């Protein structure tokens, strides 16, 4: 089932451009994106806060519907995954670049039926199934 709240961040006018192209037109904003991502709204796009609000709401709803021994596959994109992971770890979105989420990477989050138990991240960004130990599928991308 497709959940629109889990789509990738809207890069707005940056959509489809390589980082080098963005640097040519928006050097200061790109610098801020790297240094203070939680403060940037991409031109005609979204902010990390926008993504986090919609993705956390969707994740919480998914979690609330789980039953004993349910196995759920959630497929999402880089910014969505990173905001969910930041939220689970209780870290600021200013630290979002500390988390790698490669294209096709697998992250496993164990949920518990007891709502007082915090979900556990048991695997993060597994990419070996893509043919290499180090993921380079997004080289040059934002």
PLM regions with names:
Residues 68-79:
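Generic beta-sheet signal
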Residues 78-82, 105:
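GST superfamily/GST-like fold recognition
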Residues 29-50:
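Short glycine/proline- and acidic residue-enriched helix-loop micro-motifs
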Residues 61, 65, 87-91, 112:
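Active-site catalytic microenvironments for nucleophilic, acid-base chemistry
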Residues 1-30:
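Phosphate-coordination/substrate-recognition cap region in phosphate-metabolizing enzymes
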Residues 23, 48, 52-56:
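Amphipathic, non-transmembrane alpha-helical scaffold segments
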Residues 1-5, 110-142:
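Conserved histidine-centered catalytic loops in small-molecule metabolism enzymes
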Residues 92-116:
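Domain-level recognition of soluble alpha/beta enzyme cores
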């Amino acid at each position: 089932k497709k959940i629109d709240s889990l789509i990738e961040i809207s890069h707005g006018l940056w959509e489809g451009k390589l980082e080098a192209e963005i640097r040519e037109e928006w050097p200061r904003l790109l610098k801020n994106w790297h240094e203070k991502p939680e403060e940037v709204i991409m031109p005609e796009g979204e902010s990390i806060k926008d993504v986090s609000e919609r993705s956390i709401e969707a994740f919480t709803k998914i979690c609330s519907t789980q039953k004993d021994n349910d196995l759920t596959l959630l497929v999402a994109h880089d910014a969505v995954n990173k905001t969910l992971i930041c939220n689970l770890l209780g870290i600021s979105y200013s630290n979002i670049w500390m988390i790698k989420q490669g294209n096709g990477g697998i992250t496993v989050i164990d949920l518990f039926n007891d709502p007082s138990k915090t979900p556990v991240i048991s695997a993060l960004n597994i990419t070996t199934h893509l043919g290499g130990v180090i993921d380079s599928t997004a080289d040059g991308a934002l």
